[in-house]
């Protein structure tokens, strides 16, 4: 079935963008590693779907608020309708590529946002095409959707991009359950080429040995060494021998806590350093 749809899409030129943080503190662990994401030419809706647009697609009138109520089942029905009518949405699509309609991936969303192609709404929560992950290990570097690896209830969740309620320039990655109807969500669509070939992903394993050695060094520098140096400089050298256990424990604790806020920047993963998944 082909529908006479009038949805507006804007072209986002191919390019690259960096996603994530390279700050070393533990509070940034879920946002690491910083990595390069390359995007092809794709089309994105400048605005999220409105109630009128959604009513037109589904061919029945929605009540107030229903355009912000989503579940996986409802989303799949909508995408099926739109993919069947993809030629109507963008008549001059490149026929040499296979295209799909779906929510944007995080890389596509960031690229469109950087290029000022999209309009955001204060306090909104936009559905993304990516699965929920604890960090960016295994993230797709060619901007294809990230699928869920593993078991558990998080497989029913989807990643979302949440906009600050007062500052339009602040946004953060969050998630929403899609196994049931969920209020407060918005949907923006992309028409993007299906990625061919094996995906390129952020390596799943970090250099654990190096991270442990670095942590021991910084715990010593910020915690253990000052813990022993301070009583020595204050003329309390005897306490170093009698209370060494307390000094060591205190130094370990303080050095450990400093890691929550500061550690040296972590390496950035570039596209050419990505892991090709067979």
Which residues does each PLM region occupy?
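An exposed tryptophan-centered "aromatic clamp" motif
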Residues: 111-147, 239-240
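Extended beta-strand/loop cores of jelly-roll/beta-sandwich
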Residues: 1-108, 112-114, 167, 171-278
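Alpha-helix capping/hinge segments and adjacent helical runs
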Residues: 130-173, 179, 185-187, 191
């Amino acid at each position: 079935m082909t529908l006479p749809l009038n949805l507006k899409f804007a072209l986002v030129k191919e390019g690259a963008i960096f996603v994530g943080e390279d700050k070393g503190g533990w509070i940034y662990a879920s946002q690491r590693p910083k990595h390069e994401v390359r995007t092809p030419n794709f089309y994105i809706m400048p605005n999220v779907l409105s109630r009128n647009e959604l009513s037109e697609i589904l061919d029945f009138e929605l009540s107030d608020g229903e355009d912000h109520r989503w579940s996986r089942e409802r989303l799949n029905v909508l995408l099926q309708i739109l993919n069947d009518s993809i030629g109507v949405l963008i008549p001059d699509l490149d026929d040499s590529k296979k295209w799909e309609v779906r929510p944007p991936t995080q890389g596509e969303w960031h690229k469109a946002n950087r290029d000022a192609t999209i309009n955001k709404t204060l306090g909104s929560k936009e559905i993304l095409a990516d699965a929920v992950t604890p960090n960016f290990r295994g993230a797709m570097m060619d901007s294809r959707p990230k699928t869920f690896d593993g078991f558990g209830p998080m497989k029913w969740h989807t990643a979302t991009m949440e906009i600050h309620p007062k500052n339009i320039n602040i946004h953060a990655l969050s998630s929403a359950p899609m196994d049931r109807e969920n209020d407060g969500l918005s949907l923006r669509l992309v028409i993007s080429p299906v990625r061919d070939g094996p995906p390129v992903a952020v390596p799943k394993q970090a250099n654990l040995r190096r991270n442990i050695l670095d942590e021991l060094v910084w715990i010593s520098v910020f915690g253990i060494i000052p813990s022993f140096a301070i009583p020595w400089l204050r003329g309390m050298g005897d306490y170093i021998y009698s209370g060494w256990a307390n000094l060591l424990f205190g130094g370990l604790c303080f050095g450990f806590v400093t890691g929550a806020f500061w550690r040296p920047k972590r390496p950035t993963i570039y596209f050419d350093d990505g892991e090709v998944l067979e």
